[in-house]
């Protein structure tokens, strides 16, 4: 969508768009602010994440908004690994390769299609027809735990916890190198520090990449605040590690971007540089498994939150998927 700025524009970009974007586009002021922060707005052909950018008459503002799904979302008989269910919510363990909700090019086979089959109309409607019950998401090729709202009151309560960053989200990942205090490559990397227990803290801002709209990029001003804490659980000859990543915030691709930023991209991550040459210390079939790992080695292993109705704190865990287990077994069997 392109907006041409007319006479006497508002003094800053966010206010100007709130005034100039047609109501028919259904873009609220808060949604426009998020689009700016995410790098989805270009001023005169150049991406800007500054909501205070000055405008003059004749400026051209391009807004990139994902197209709506134009097909009906239908129930599909897809098996679900249900960890918990009550009248207000359901907790599922999403498999690798499953998209959370329909999107352009993926109208079926999603978690939403499966949820509609299993729960029908017993899902929160706050997310709209295309995202019933969906409170948060994980990437298609990331496995692990999601909580889905069955009632609107649960949706409001859960969404508030994710917004306040009080939900506890822990991921397990397999990355290149060993991201600990002994790694000289981490010295001087902007946005990094070490906490008690050798935990690496990564603090940056994230926004959509200026040239590749499918990626996120690290910024230090103008994006959305993002914090990840990384703890090494197991390492293999200083060349591969299993790590726990704890999200303080939950931005798109956050763990993958942060691990790439600190020079420890996830094994198999084709977008953020995890497909790199395997160390000579890894040999034989193990080297082939690492080099050919088909997706980012990332699993949403633990989710904790306060039940939005009962107030009880609940925590759920999901075992590593088979492909990551096999990768770890190969590394351990390689004598590293």
Question: Can you say where each PLM-predicted feature lies in the sequence?
Answer:
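RNA pseudouridine synthases
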Residues: 1-336
């Amino acid at each position: 969508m392109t907006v041409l700025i007319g006479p006497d524009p508002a003094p800053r970009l966010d206010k100007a768009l709130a005034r100039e974007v047609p109501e028919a586009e259904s873009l609220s002021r808060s949604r426009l602010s998020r689009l700016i922060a995410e790098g989805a707005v270009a001023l005169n052909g150049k991406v800007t994440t500054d909501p205070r950018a000055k405008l003059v008459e004749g400026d051209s503002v391009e807004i990139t908004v994902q197209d709506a799904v134009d097909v009906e979302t239908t129930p599909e008989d897809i098996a679900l690994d249900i960890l918990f269910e009550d009248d207000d919510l359901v907790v599922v363990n999403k498999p690798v390769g499953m998209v959370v909700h329909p999107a352009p090019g993926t109208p079926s086979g999603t978690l939403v299609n499966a949820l509609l089959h299993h729960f029908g109309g017993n899902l929160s409607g706050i997310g709209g027809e295309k995202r019933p019950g969906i409170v948060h998401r994980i990437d298609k090729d990331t496995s692990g735990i999601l909580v889905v709202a069955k009632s609107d009151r649960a949706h409001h309560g859960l969404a508030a916890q994710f917004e306040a960053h009080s939900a506890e989200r822990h991921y397990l990942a397999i990355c290149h190198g060993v991201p600990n205090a002994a790694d000289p490559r981490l010295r001087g990397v902007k946005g990094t520090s070490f906490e008690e227990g050798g935990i690496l803290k990564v603090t940056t801002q994230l926004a959509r990449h200026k040239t590749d709209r499918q990626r996120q990029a690290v910024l230090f001003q103008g994006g959305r605040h993002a914090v990840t804490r990384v703890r090494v659980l197991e390492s293999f000859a200083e060349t591969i590690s299993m790590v726990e990543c704890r999200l303080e915030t939950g931005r798109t691709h956050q763990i993958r971007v942060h691990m790439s930023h600190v020079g420890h991209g996830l094994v198999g991550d084709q977008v953020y540089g995890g497909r790199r040459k395997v160390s000579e210390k890894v040999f034989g079939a193990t080297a082939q498994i690492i080099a050919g790992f088909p997706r980012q080695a990332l699993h949403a292993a633990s989710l904790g939150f306060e039940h939005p109705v009962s107030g009880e704190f609940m925590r759920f865990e999901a075992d590593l998927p088979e492909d990551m287990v096999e990768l770890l077994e190969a590394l351990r069997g390689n004598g590293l």
